[in-house]
């Protein structure tokens, strides 16, 4: 269990780094385009709970993957349908935590309008990827997936 916690923390600190990378990219774009940032203490403080919530949600979801002896990033299809922990509330807690909360939180903390826009624009793309994955999950898990899908929302 301790090793799973360490792996989860390591994996999710990487996602936070990517979130700040997107925010820094946005800051650079703001500078190149002459867009005024909105960096302030209030915006920075507002970003902290978003980032923390995203990290917690991803860590919780990652731990559930590890407890089921699954990889968070895998090219092979899932063999287990996880419906416990954060998966009781969202079918996509990894994406919700990372691609939404962490990315928006980092963008707020750095006060970058471009980073917020990049984050907002990539969510529909991620949603398309999720829909594709869900078709595969339906083929793999059949009726079990359909019952889960009916009970739990994709995002929130």
List PLM regions with ranges.
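Histidine-centered phosphotransfer motif of kinases
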Residues: 89-96
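Membrane-anchoring alpha-helices and their flanking helix-loop junctions
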Residues: 1-84, 97-156
